[in-house]
Amino acid sequence: MPILTESLTEKKPLAGNNEINQLAFVVHDIEKTSELFAKLLGIPKPAWFLTGDSEVSKVVFRSKPTNSRSKLVFMNTPTVQFELIEPNEEPGTMREFLDTVGEGIHHIAFDVDSIKEKLPIFEENGYPLLQSGEFTSSDGRYVYVDTLKDHKTLIELLESAEPRDTEQSKESYEPLLGTNKVEQLAIVVKDLDAAAEAYCKLLGVEKPQVIQSGPSELTKVVFEGEPTQGDSKYLFINTPLLQIELIEPGKSPSTWKKHLETHGEGVHHISFVIKNMNEKIKLLEEMGYPVIQTGNFYNGKGRYAYMDTTLDFKVIIELLERFDS
């Protein structure tokens, strides 16, 4: 989908800011997955570390102390930070996600000055505390709030005594797609207006314009090898680092409709703006990542391709190419 510019307003975000700084993936094999993500982003493979035991981490899940521990890897990009999480078998939100949903994006994160101040705001808005804990390698703490119903993903609040390390690796290689800048996080929803209201309240912004998919002779959507109208309506919400896209599928076949029918509401893809679309599609197909759907922007100013990268990257990757670039 095309990326639009939408100004932010002065409404107050629930977390005190609207900077989504992290996309966190729960995975079965952090060693293998971190190697794949390092190649995608063009950085050296970082080493994972194990979170502390219960005396250090003090994890409480659904109001009960737990010995939940996880292997973690952090990878910085020009926009958001990727976090990879391999949980142990003890009760915890990541273990629960892996057992019930499978691998994928578990949460988005915001930095806050004080969890003690911000958590009650979320709770007053109907988002209860799900899990809390202390950082292992630095002075800080986190909480997960249960925003799944409204935001289709969980939200983490991070409180750090010192600024977290978000600097990109000084040693870098050519990213797989020619860029490592994540542009979008896209979420498929049943009710666009309701989801938009929830996100705009979370982020402290006015509701953006709803966009209807363009005529099929312009968009030329092909889904799983067959032409389709691929109708939908959607909108874009800009944040400082990442754009949120909310998509409500129409009745005709499309990747969004299939996702909604198969997996329900939730994260559908992340996006990268690239050049030489045909070359990138060929590269990914040769690596074993087939095309799911292609089409043109609703306004005819670019095109997109969804690649089936879920096995390795735990989410669909969308390639975006602007015709004026």
Name what the model sees in each region.
Residues P44-E96, R141-P163, E206-K258, N296, ...:
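Conserved short beta-strand elements that form part of the metal-binding/catalytic scaffold
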